[in-house]
């Protein structure tokens, strides 16, 4: 064997055998000749079939004990009984915990977590909201949480949460934006760097047909 061939072999390069260096998955044979693939982006791949995939996933959770248990296991392991706040504010002097202030903070946090305060609809306590968010991510892939900076239910804290199902994001809202050059992609306005700027939500759930009327196609733009 010549010195050149030895050098090529040591470097892992064999000029006479280029075919053998190709990825096996890219070769055409009787086993792969009917294997049709696409090189579309993630958005293009899911566009047009997102709602169908989401609905099938939800039905699977409703009808299958295995899928339902998998969702329950995710919620139990990620959230459990919910986030517990432990305040550790230090005193200005002495380097010790301010126990009195910490107790007041923890009490205020716990009180805000009541369903009449933390949920704009007054239906879910904060632990239930957490479980719903994680469950929706497991089942539907995503969920939206809108922060409302005003008090609800007589709360002293101007802060509450609104859960918005992913169905309400209008995936058909696609195209160029107005003057700023941003682009709408499946209900999400993104800038030149792909950062989400604004969302186009339907004001009513599209599946709530008996109660939606024409208002279902009116958009609520949130940033």
Feature-to-residue mapping (PLM):
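Structured, mid-chain assembly/scaffold modules that mediate subunit interfaces
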Residues: 70-223
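N-terminal-proximal low-complexity accessory segments that begin disordered
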Residues: 1-94
């Amino acid at each position: 064997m010549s010195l050149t061939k030895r050098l090529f072999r040591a470097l892992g390069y064999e000029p006479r055998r280029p075919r053998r260096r190709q990825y096996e998955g890219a070769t055409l044979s009787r086993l792969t000749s009917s294997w049709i693939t696409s090189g579309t982006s993630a958005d293009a791949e899911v566009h047009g079939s997102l709602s169908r995939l989401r609905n099938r996933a939800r039905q699977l959770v409703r009808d299958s004990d295995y899928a339902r248990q998998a969702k329950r296991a995710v919620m139990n392991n990620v959230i459990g009984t919910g986030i517990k706040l432990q305040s550790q504010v230090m005193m200005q002097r002495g380097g010790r915990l301010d126990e009195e202030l910490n107790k007041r903070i923890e009490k205020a946090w716990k009180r805000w977590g009541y369903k009449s305060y933390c949920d704009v609809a007054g239906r879910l306590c904060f632990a239930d909201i957490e479980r719903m968010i994680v469950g929706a991510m497991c089942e539907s892939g995503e969920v939206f949480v809108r922060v409302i900076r005003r008090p609800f239910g007589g709360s002293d804290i101007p802060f509450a949460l609104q859960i918005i199902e992913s169905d309400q994001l209008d995936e058909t809202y696609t195209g160029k934006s107005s003057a700023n050059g941003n682009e709408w992609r499946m209900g999400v306005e993104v800038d030149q760097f792909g950062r989400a700027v604004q969302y186009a939500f339907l004001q009513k759930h599209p599946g709530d047909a008996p109660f939606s009327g024409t208002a279902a196609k009116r958009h609520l733009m949130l940033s």
